Amino acid sequence: MVAGLLGGSAVRAQQVYQPNWDSLKGYQVPDWFRDAKFGIFIHWGVYSVPAFGSEWYPRNMYLQGSAENKHQVETYGPIEKFGYKDFIPRFTASKFDPVAWVTLFKKAGARYVVPVAEHHDGFAMYKTALSRWNAFNMGPHRDVVGELAAEIKKQGLVFGLSSHRIEHWWFMNGGRHFASDFVDMKNTDFYGPAREQNETPSPEYMNDWLMRCTELVDKYQPQLFWFDWWIEQPAMDPYRKTFASFYYNKGLEWNKGVVINYKNAAYPDNTAVLDLERGKLAGIRNPAWQTDDAIGNKSWGYAAGNTFKDARYVITNLVDIVSKNGNLLLNIGPRSDGTITDEETATLLGTGKWLEVNGEAIYGTRPWKVFGEGPTESASGSFADQKIPFTAKDVRFTAKGPVVYAIMLGIPSGNSVIKALAAGAGNGTVARISVLGSSETVRWKQQNDGLVILPSAHAPADYAMAYKIELR
Protein backbone atom coordinates (compact mmCIF):
# COMPACT_ATOMS: atom_id res chain seq x y z
CA MET A 1 0.00 0.00 0.00
CA VAL A 2 2.85 2.40 0.86
CA ALA A 3 4.52 1.98 -2.53
CA GLY A 4 1.16 2.18 -4.26
CA LEU A 5 0.59 5.69 -2.97
CA LEU A 6 3.39 6.95 -5.19
CA GLY A 7 1.46 6.05 -8.30
CA GLY A 8 2.83 6.85 -11.72
CA SER A 9 5.41 9.24 -10.34
CA ALA A 10 7.42 6.37 -8.90
CA VAL A 11 6.99 4.33 -12.05
CA ARG A 12 8.59 7.05 -14.16
CA ALA A 13 11.71 7.18 -12.00
CA GLN A 14 14.53 4.75 -12.65
CA GLN A 15 14.09 1.82 -10.27
CA VAL A 16 17.71 1.36 -9.17
CA TYR A 17 16.94 1.77 -5.47
CA GLN A 18 14.42 -0.48 -3.76
CA PRO A 19 12.68 0.27 -0.44
CA ASN A 20 14.91 -1.91 1.70
CA TRP A 21 18.08 -1.15 3.65
CA ASP A 22 20.32 -3.50 1.65
CA SER A 23 19.44 -1.64 -1.53
CA LEU A 24 19.67 1.80 0.07
CA LYS A 25 23.16 1.06 1.38
CA GLY A 26 24.29 1.42 -2.22
CA TYR A 27 23.75 5.17 -1.82
CA GLN A 28 26.76 7.45 -2.29
CA VAL A 29 26.90 10.99 -0.89
CA PRO A 30 27.17 13.25 -3.96
CA ASP A 31 30.33 15.27 -4.52
CA TRP A 32 28.41 18.55 -4.65
CA PHE A 33 27.45 18.10 -0.98
CA ARG A 34 30.94 17.06 0.13
CA ASP A 35 32.42 20.01 -1.75
CA ALA A 36 29.88 22.65 -0.67
CA LYS A 37 30.58 22.60 3.09
CA PHE A 38 28.29 25.54 3.92
CA GLY A 39 24.56 26.02 3.49
CA ILE A 40 21.77 28.29 4.73
CA PHE A 41 18.70 27.04 6.60
CA ILE A 42 15.57 29.26 6.76
CA HIS A 43 12.93 28.98 9.48
CA TRP A 44 10.15 31.30 8.39
CA GLY A 45 6.45 30.92 8.91
CA VAL A 46 3.35 32.07 10.75
CA TYR A 47 5.21 31.72 14.07
CA SER A 48 7.24 34.81 13.10
CA VAL A 49 4.12 36.96 13.64
CA PRO A 50 3.82 36.62 17.44
CA ALA A 51 7.64 36.61 17.52
CA PHE A 52 7.68 35.47 21.14
CA GLY A 53 9.75 32.71 22.71
CA SER A 54 10.60 30.54 19.73
CA GLU A 55 9.24 28.82 16.64
CA TRP A 56 7.49 26.46 19.08
CA TYR A 57 5.09 29.26 19.98
CA PRO A 58 2.15 27.55 18.21
CA ARG A 59 2.49 24.58 20.53
CA ASN A 60 3.40 26.41 23.71
CA MET A 61 0.61 28.99 23.46
CA TYR A 62 -1.82 26.11 24.04
CA LEU A 63 0.06 24.77 27.09
CA GLN A 64 -1.59 26.30 30.13
CA GLY A 65 0.85 27.92 32.52
CA SER A 66 3.52 28.51 29.88
CA ALA A 67 5.02 31.94 29.23
CA GLU A 68 3.65 31.75 25.69
CA ASN A 69 0.14 31.00 26.93
CA LYS A 70 0.25 33.95 29.32
CA HIS A 71 1.61 36.22 26.58
CA GLN A 72 -1.06 35.07 24.13
CA VAL A 73 -3.95 35.80 26.48
CA GLU A 74 -2.55 39.12 27.69
CA THR A 75 -1.73 40.34 24.18
CA TYR A 76 -4.49 38.91 21.99
CA GLY A 77 -7.29 37.94 24.37
CA PRO A 78 -8.98 34.58 25.06
CA ILE A 79 -7.59 31.75 22.95
CA GLU A 80 -11.05 30.49 22.03
CA LYS A 81 -11.50 33.81 20.21
CA PHE A 82 -7.95 34.36 18.90
CA GLY A 83 -5.96 31.21 18.23
CA TYR A 84 -2.90 30.39 16.19
CA LYS A 85 -4.88 30.39 12.92
CA ASP A 86 -5.67 34.06 13.48
CA PHE A 87 -2.03 34.99 12.98
CA ILE A 88 -2.18 33.82 9.36
CA PRO A 89 -3.75 37.02 7.92
CA ARG A 90 -1.00 38.99 9.70
CA PHE A 91 1.68 36.92 8.00
CA THR A 92 1.89 39.23 5.00
CA ALA A 93 5.51 38.77 3.83
CA SER A 94 5.07 42.27 2.42
CA LYS A 95 8.83 42.85 2.05
CA PHE A 96 9.84 39.33 1.04
CA ASP A 97 12.38 39.61 -1.77
CA PRO A 98 13.83 36.25 -2.84
CA VAL A 99 16.40 37.95 -5.07
CA ALA A 100 17.78 39.96 -2.15
CA TRP A 101 17.74 36.92 0.13
CA VAL A 102 19.66 34.67 -2.23
CA THR A 103 22.09 37.45 -3.11
CA LEU A 104 22.87 37.75 0.61
CA PHE A 105 23.32 34.00 0.98
CA LYS A 106 25.70 33.97 -1.95
CA LYS A 107 27.71 36.84 -0.43
CA ALA A 108 27.86 34.79 2.77
CA GLY A 109 29.68 32.05 0.87
CA ALA A 110 26.86 29.51 1.08
CA ARG A 111 26.68 26.86 -1.62
CA TYR A 112 23.19 25.48 -0.85
CA VAL A 113 19.98 26.84 0.67
CA VAL A 114 17.28 24.93 2.58
CA PRO A 115 13.99 26.71 3.39
CA VAL A 116 11.53 25.00 5.71
CA ALA A 117 8.64 23.83 3.54
CA GLU A 118 6.41 22.94 6.48
CA HIS A 119 7.21 23.25 10.16
CA HIS A 120 5.59 21.46 13.09
CA ASP A 121 2.70 23.95 13.03
CA GLY A 122 1.26 22.37 9.87
CA PHE A 123 1.28 25.51 7.72
CA ALA A 124 2.75 24.77 4.29
CA MET A 125 5.00 27.48 2.86
CA TYR A 126 4.26 26.36 -0.68
CA LYS A 127 1.39 25.84 -3.10
CA THR A 128 -0.04 22.41 -2.42
CA ALA A 129 -3.07 20.40 -3.41
CA LEU A 130 -2.94 18.46 -0.13
CA SER A 131 -3.84 21.21 2.35
CA ARG A 132 -5.76 24.47 2.16
CA TRP A 133 -3.57 25.82 4.97
CA ASN A 134 -0.73 27.06 2.80
CA ALA A 135 1.04 30.33 2.01
CA PHE A 136 -0.29 30.48 -1.55
CA ASN A 137 -3.91 30.11 -0.47
CA MET A 138 -3.78 32.50 2.51
CA GLY A 139 -1.45 34.81 4.41
CA PRO A 140 1.06 36.17 1.89
CA HIS A 141 -0.67 34.42 -1.05
CA ARG A 142 2.73 33.45 -2.45
CA ASP A 143 4.42 30.15 -3.18
CA VAL A 144 7.36 30.97 -0.92
CA VAL A 145 9.22 27.71 -1.49
CA GLY A 146 8.63 27.90 -5.23
CA GLU A 147 9.91 31.47 -5.50
CA LEU A 148 12.99 30.65 -3.45
CA ALA A 149 13.65 27.47 -5.42
CA ALA A 150 13.63 29.38 -8.69
CA GLU A 151 15.95 32.12 -7.43
CA ILE A 152 18.35 29.77 -5.66
CA LYS A 153 18.79 27.77 -8.85
CA LYS A 154 19.00 30.93 -10.97
CA GLN A 155 21.91 32.24 -8.88
CA GLY A 156 23.76 28.95 -9.18
CA LEU A 157 23.26 27.57 -5.68
CA VAL A 158 21.83 24.17 -4.78
CA PHE A 159 18.22 24.10 -3.64
CA GLY A 160 17.02 21.92 -0.80
CA LEU A 161 14.07 21.98 1.59
CA SER A 162 12.95 20.58 4.92
CA SER A 163 9.80 18.88 6.17
CA HIS A 164 8.79 18.76 9.83
CA ARG A 165 5.33 17.44 9.00
CA ILE A 166 5.52 14.24 11.03
CA GLU A 167 5.80 16.18 14.32
CA HIS A 168 2.43 17.80 13.60
CA TRP A 169 0.83 14.52 14.70
CA TRP A 170 1.14 15.71 18.32
CA PHE A 171 2.44 19.28 18.13
CA MET A 172 -0.81 21.17 18.75
CA ASN A 173 -2.34 18.80 21.31
CA GLY A 174 -2.45 21.33 24.17
CA GLY A 175 -5.50 22.98 22.65
CA ARG A 176 -7.59 19.88 23.33
CA HIS A 177 -7.30 20.26 27.10
CA PHE A 178 -9.01 23.61 27.74
CA ALA A 179 -11.40 26.06 26.10
CA SER A 180 -9.69 27.10 22.87
CA ASP A 181 -10.45 27.58 19.19
CA PHE A 182 -9.94 23.82 18.74
CA VAL A 183 -13.67 23.37 19.34
CA ASP A 184 -14.45 25.01 15.99
CA MET A 185 -14.60 22.17 13.48
CA LYS A 186 -13.45 24.52 10.70
CA ASN A 187 -9.98 24.40 12.25
CA THR A 188 -9.67 20.63 12.62
CA ASP A 189 -7.74 20.10 9.39
CA PHE A 190 -5.16 22.66 10.57
CA TYR A 191 -4.75 21.85 14.25
CA GLY A 192 -5.29 18.11 14.03
CA PRO A 193 -4.57 15.31 14.66
CA ALA A 194 -3.18 16.81 17.92
CA ARG A 195 -2.62 13.37 19.41
CA GLU A 196 -0.34 12.52 22.32
CA GLN A 197 3.36 12.23 21.57
CA ASN A 198 3.49 8.64 22.80
CA GLU A 199 0.80 7.56 20.32
CA THR A 200 1.93 5.84 17.14
CA PRO A 201 0.94 7.81 14.03
CA SER A 202 -1.95 6.27 12.15
CA PRO A 203 -1.39 4.70 8.71
CA GLU A 204 -3.57 7.45 7.24
CA TYR A 205 -1.34 10.13 8.73
CA MET A 206 1.88 8.44 7.63
CA ASN A 207 0.48 8.01 4.12
CA ASP A 208 -0.35 11.72 4.09
CA TRP A 209 3.23 12.46 5.22
CA LEU A 210 4.59 10.40 2.33
CA MET A 211 2.31 12.07 -0.20
CA ARG A 212 3.36 15.55 0.96
CA CYS A 213 7.03 14.63 0.74
CA THR A 214 6.77 13.17 -2.75
CA GLU A 215 4.70 16.15 -3.89
CA LEU A 216 7.54 18.45 -2.78
CA VAL A 217 10.06 16.34 -4.68
CA ASP A 218 7.99 16.34 -7.87
CA LYS A 219 7.12 20.06 -7.74
CA TYR A 220 10.48 21.58 -6.82
CA GLN A 221 13.20 18.96 -7.51
CA PRO A 222 15.21 19.67 -4.34
CA GLN A 223 18.69 18.18 -4.20
CA LEU A 224 18.54 17.98 -0.42
CA PHE A 225 15.61 16.88 1.74
CA TRP A 226 16.03 17.54 5.46
CA PHE A 227 13.97 15.71 8.09
CA ASP A 228 13.55 16.52 11.74
CA TRP A 229 13.84 13.93 14.47
CA TRP A 230 10.40 12.31 14.83
CA ILE A 231 10.58 10.33 11.59
CA GLU A 232 12.58 7.80 13.62
CA GLN A 233 9.32 6.32 14.96
CA PRO A 234 9.41 2.52 14.39
CA ALA A 235 6.07 2.65 12.58
CA MET A 236 7.66 5.02 10.04
CA ASP A 237 10.23 2.44 8.93
CA PRO A 238 8.49 1.39 5.68
CA TYR A 239 7.66 5.01 4.86
CA ARG A 240 11.25 6.16 5.41
CA LYS A 241 12.51 3.40 3.11
CA THR A 242 9.86 4.09 0.50
CA PHE A 243 10.62 7.79 0.43
CA ALA A 244 14.39 7.23 0.22
CA SER A 245 14.10 4.82 -2.70
CA PHE A 246 11.67 7.15 -4.47
CA TYR A 247 13.87 10.21 -3.95
CA TYR A 248 17.16 8.53 -4.84
CA ASN A 249 15.62 7.15 -8.01
CA LYS A 250 14.36 10.64 -8.83
CA GLY A 251 17.92 11.92 -8.45
CA LEU A 252 19.04 9.38 -11.03
CA GLU A 253 16.21 10.44 -13.32
CA TRP A 254 17.27 14.10 -12.98
CA ASN A 255 20.97 13.16 -13.28
CA LYS A 256 21.61 15.05 -10.03
CA GLY A 257 22.99 13.80 -6.75
CA VAL A 258 20.50 14.12 -3.90
CA VAL A 259 20.83 14.06 -0.12
CA ILE A 260 18.52 13.08 2.73
CA ASN A 261 19.42 14.58 6.11
CA TYR A 262 18.22 12.72 9.19
CA LYS A 263 18.74 12.86 12.95
CA ASN A 264 19.54 10.22 15.55
CA ALA A 265 19.01 6.72 14.11
CA ALA A 266 16.21 7.33 11.60
CA TYR A 267 18.40 5.97 8.78
CA PRO A 268 21.28 3.48 9.01
CA ASP A 269 24.80 4.62 8.16
CA ASN A 270 25.50 4.84 4.43
CA THR A 271 21.84 5.23 3.45
CA ALA A 272 21.54 9.00 4.09
CA VAL A 273 23.48 11.86 5.73
CA LEU A 274 23.46 12.26 9.51
CA ASP A 275 22.60 15.71 10.87
CA LEU A 276 23.35 16.95 14.40
CA GLU A 277 21.23 19.80 15.74
CA ARG A 278 23.33 22.55 17.33
CA GLY A 279 26.10 20.02 17.77
CA LYS A 280 29.39 18.65 16.50
CA LEU A 281 31.62 15.60 16.63
CA ALA A 282 34.83 15.02 18.55
CA GLY A 283 36.65 13.55 15.55
CA ILE A 284 36.52 12.67 11.86
CA ARG A 285 33.46 10.72 10.75
CA ASN A 286 33.13 8.73 7.57
CA PRO A 287 30.67 8.97 5.87
CA ALA A 288 30.04 12.70 5.55
CA TRP A 289 27.74 14.39 8.05
CA GLN A 290 26.23 17.79 8.81
CA THR A 291 25.58 20.18 11.68
CA ASP A 292 22.52 22.39 11.61
CA ASP A 293 22.95 25.44 13.83
CA ALA A 294 21.27 28.82 14.09
CA ILE A 295 22.72 32.31 14.24
CA GLY A 296 19.99 32.97 16.79
CA ASN A 297 20.78 31.47 20.18
CA LYS A 298 17.24 31.22 21.58
CA SER A 299 15.05 30.53 18.56
CA TRP A 300 15.25 29.19 15.02
CA GLY A 301 12.42 31.44 13.90
CA TYR A 302 12.26 35.19 14.44
CA ALA A 303 11.59 36.12 18.07
CA ALA A 304 11.96 39.43 19.86
CA GLY A 305 14.83 39.44 22.35
CA ASN A 306 16.87 36.80 20.56
CA THR A 307 20.65 36.96 20.84
CA PHE A 308 22.98 36.08 18.01
CA LYS A 309 26.25 34.38 17.16
CA ASP A 310 28.86 36.54 15.50
CA ALA A 311 30.98 35.81 12.44
CA ARG A 312 33.94 34.66 14.53
CA TYR A 313 31.84 31.94 16.13
CA VAL A 314 30.47 30.78 12.79
CA ILE A 315 33.85 30.78 11.03
CA THR A 316 35.80 28.91 13.70
CA ASN A 317 33.06 26.32 14.13
CA LEU A 318 32.67 25.91 10.36
CA VAL A 319 36.39 25.15 10.15
CA ASP A 320 36.17 22.67 13.03
CA ILE A 321 33.21 20.90 11.39
CA VAL A 322 34.81 20.76 7.92
CA SER A 323 38.04 19.33 9.37
CA LYS A 324 35.95 16.39 10.63
CA ASN A 325 34.25 15.68 7.27
CA GLY A 326 31.13 17.69 8.05
CA ASN A 327 29.06 20.50 6.58
CA LEU A 328 27.45 23.44 8.38
CA LEU A 329 23.81 24.31 7.65
CA LEU A 330 23.40 27.73 9.27
CA ASN A 331 19.92 29.01 10.06
CA ILE A 332 18.35 32.44 9.88
CA GLY A 333 14.86 33.43 11.06
CA PRO A 334 13.38 36.31 9.03
CA ARG A 335 10.71 38.63 10.40
CA SER A 336 7.09 38.10 9.37
CA ASP A 337 7.39 40.85 6.73
CA GLY A 338 10.28 39.02 5.06
CA THR A 339 13.16 41.19 6.27
CA ILE A 340 16.31 39.64 7.72
CA THR A 341 17.67 41.05 10.97
CA ASP A 342 20.72 43.30 10.98
CA GLU A 343 22.50 40.91 13.34
CA GLU A 344 22.03 37.89 11.07
CA THR A 345 22.99 39.94 8.02
CA ALA A 346 26.21 41.10 9.71
CA THR A 347 27.14 37.54 10.69
CA LEU A 348 26.49 36.26 7.17
CA LEU A 349 28.49 39.02 5.52
CA GLY A 350 31.36 38.60 7.98
CA THR A 351 31.45 34.89 7.26
CA GLY A 352 31.41 35.54 3.53
CA LYS A 353 34.24 38.05 3.78
CA TRP A 354 36.42 35.42 5.46
CA LEU A 355 35.47 32.72 2.97
CA GLU A 356 36.28 35.03 0.07
CA VAL A 357 39.89 34.99 1.27
CA ASN A 358 40.10 31.48 2.71
CA GLY A 359 37.54 29.47 0.76
CA GLU A 360 40.30 27.43 -0.89
CA ALA A 361 40.89 25.78 2.50
CA ILE A 362 37.18 24.92 2.87
CA TYR A 363 35.38 24.24 -0.41
CA GLY A 364 36.21 20.97 -2.14
CA THR A 365 38.50 19.78 0.64
CA ARG A 366 38.55 16.45 2.40
CA PRO A 367 39.70 15.52 5.91
CA TRP A 368 43.43 15.03 6.45
CA LYS A 369 44.95 12.21 8.51
CA VAL A 370 43.98 13.99 11.73
CA PHE A 371 41.42 16.75 12.18
CA GLY A 372 43.60 19.05 14.26
CA GLU A 373 45.35 19.78 17.50
CA GLY A 374 45.37 22.37 20.25
CA PRO A 375 44.24 23.01 23.81
CA THR A 376 40.54 23.80 23.33
CA GLU A 377 38.20 20.83 23.57
CA SER A 378 35.56 20.77 20.86
CA ALA A 379 31.92 20.37 21.85
CA SER A 380 30.54 16.96 20.88
CA GLY A 381 27.04 15.61 20.26
CA SER A 382 23.69 17.25 19.54
CA PHE A 383 22.66 20.40 21.41
CA ALA A 384 26.29 21.14 22.23
CA ASP A 385 27.07 24.64 21.03
CA GLN A 386 30.74 25.52 21.47
CA LYS A 387 30.85 27.26 24.86
CA ILE A 388 34.63 27.77 25.05
CA PRO A 389 36.00 29.88 22.18
CA PHE A 390 38.82 28.55 20.07
CA THR A 391 42.21 30.27 20.12
CA ALA A 392 45.17 30.82 17.82
CA LYS A 393 46.79 27.75 19.40
CA ASP A 394 43.99 25.57 18.01
CA VAL A 395 44.63 24.33 14.48
CA ARG A 396 42.37 22.40 12.12
CA PHE A 397 43.46 20.56 8.98
CA THR A 398 41.82 20.10 5.59
CA ALA A 399 43.39 18.62 2.47
CA LYS A 400 43.37 18.55 -1.32
CA GLY A 401 45.77 15.96 -2.69
CA PRO A 402 49.34 16.81 -1.61
CA VAL A 403 48.25 20.13 -0.08
CA VAL A 404 47.36 20.40 3.60
CA TYR A 405 45.64 23.52 4.93
CA ALA A 406 46.43 24.34 8.54
CA ILE A 407 43.82 26.80 9.77
CA MET A 408 44.62 28.60 13.01
CA LEU A 409 41.38 29.37 14.86
CA GLY A 410 42.68 32.79 15.82
CA ILE A 411 45.37 35.17 14.58
CA PRO A 412 48.78 34.01 15.88
CA SER A 413 50.90 36.62 17.63
CA GLY A 414 53.84 34.28 18.19
CA ASN A 415 55.26 31.10 16.71
CA SER A 416 52.78 28.39 15.73
CA VAL A 417 53.94 24.82 16.36
CA ILE A 418 52.17 22.01 14.48
CA LYS A 419 53.11 18.68 16.02
CA ALA A 420 51.39 16.56 13.35
CA LEU A 421 53.88 17.90 10.80
CA ALA A 422 57.01 17.35 12.84
CA ALA A 423 59.97 16.00 10.87
CA GLY A 424 59.65 12.61 12.54
CA ALA A 425 55.86 12.33 12.48
CA GLY A 426 55.77 10.50 9.16
CA ASN A 427 53.15 12.80 7.66
CA GLY A 428 55.26 14.29 4.89
CA THR A 429 58.08 16.66 4.15
CA VAL A 430 57.12 20.30 3.82
CA ALA A 431 58.15 21.89 0.52
CA ARG A 432 56.45 25.29 0.72
CA ILE A 433 54.11 27.29 2.95
CA SER A 434 52.01 30.32 2.06
CA VAL A 435 49.22 32.28 3.71
CA LEU A 436 45.91 32.35 1.83
CA GLY A 437 45.11 35.87 0.75
CA SER A 438 48.66 37.14 1.16
CA SER A 439 51.84 37.34 -0.91
CA GLU A 440 53.97 37.57 2.21
CA THR A 441 56.85 35.09 2.48
CA VAL A 442 56.23 32.67 5.32
CA ARG A 443 59.18 31.76 7.55
CA TRP A 444 59.11 28.21 8.88
CA LYS A 445 61.21 25.28 10.14
CA GLN A 446 60.26 21.59 10.11
CA GLN A 447 61.82 20.27 13.30
CA ASN A 448 61.62 17.00 15.21
CA ASP A 449 59.24 18.55 17.74
CA GLY A 450 56.96 20.14 15.17
CA LEU A 451 56.53 22.40 12.18
CA VAL A 452 57.33 25.87 13.49
CA ILE A 453 55.71 28.77 11.60
CA LEU A 454 56.84 32.25 12.51
CA PRO A 455 54.12 34.90 12.84
CA SER A 456 53.09 36.86 9.77
CA ALA A 457 53.24 40.63 9.73
CA HIS A 458 49.70 40.94 8.43
CA ALA A 459 46.55 38.84 8.72
CA PRO A 460 44.61 38.88 5.42
CA ALA A 461 41.30 38.14 7.18
CA ASP A 462 39.84 38.39 10.65
CA TYR A 463 39.27 35.57 13.15
CA ALA A 464 41.29 32.71 11.62
CA MET A 465 44.38 32.32 9.42
CA ALA A 466 44.86 29.58 6.83
CA TYR A 467 48.31 28.29 5.89
CA LYS A 468 48.66 26.39 2.64
CA ILE A 469 51.27 23.67 3.20
CA GLU A 470 52.58 21.89 0.12
CA LEU A 471 54.14 18.50 0.82
CA ARG A 472 56.74 16.61 -1.18
For every predicted segment, state its role.
Residues 9-13:
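Sec/Tat signal peptide C-region and signal peptidase I cleavage site
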Residues 14-472:
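Mature catalytic domains of secreted/periplasmic carbohydrate-active enzymes
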